UniProtKB/Swiss-Prot annotation:
<keyword id="KW-1003">Cell membrane</keyword>
<keyword id="KW-1133">Transmembrane helix</keyword>
<dbReference type="Pfam" id="PF13974">
    <property type="entry name" value="YebO"/>
</dbReference>
<dbReference type="GO" id="GO:0005886">
    <property type="term" value="C:plasma membrane"/>
</dbReference>
<dbReference type="InterPro" id="IPR025594">
    <property type="entry name" value="YebO"/>
</dbReference>
<keyword id="KW-0472">Membrane</keyword>
<feature type="region of interest" description="Disordered">
    <location>
        <begin position="67"/>
        <end position="91"/>
    </location>
</feature>
<keyword id="KW-0812">Transmembrane</keyword>
<protein>
    <recommendedName>
        <fullName>Uncharacterized protein YPO1740/y2567/YP_1481</fullName>
    </recommendedName>
</protein>
<feature type="transmembrane region" description="Helical">
    <location>
        <begin position="11"/>
        <end position="31"/>
    </location>
</feature>
Length: 91
């Protein structure tokens, strides 16, 4: 009788650490996966920001070529940001 009780405790003493290790491995897997996804999203957002900077530079160069103005010159075709001070866009 005592032998059967000890075998049940023996199985429980082995199963509990195994389940604990399995639980922590599963948690580690999902945390690692979330970290990798976050790093990918940060990398993609940086690429998008860099592309937008290049597009802005190209558009500025095209505007300068089309109007023949530089940053220090004013022209009647260029629009001042103050012109849109009270402007509310439609949604």
């Amino acid at each position: 009788m005592l032998d059967t009780n000890m075998s049940a405790f023996g199985v429980a003493s082995i199963a509990l650490p195994l389940l604990t290790v399995l639980f922590f491995l599963i948690v580690w897997f999902f945390l690692s996966r979330a970290s990798v996804r976050a790093n990918e999203q940060v990398r993609l957002l940086r690429e998008i920001a860099e592309q937008q900077k290049r597009q802005t530079e190209l558009l500025t160069a095209l505007l300068e070529n089309a109007t023949g103005t530089r940053d220090g010159q004013n022209d009647s075709d260029t629009v001042s940001p103050l012109d849109f001070k009270g402007f509310i866009p439609e949604r």
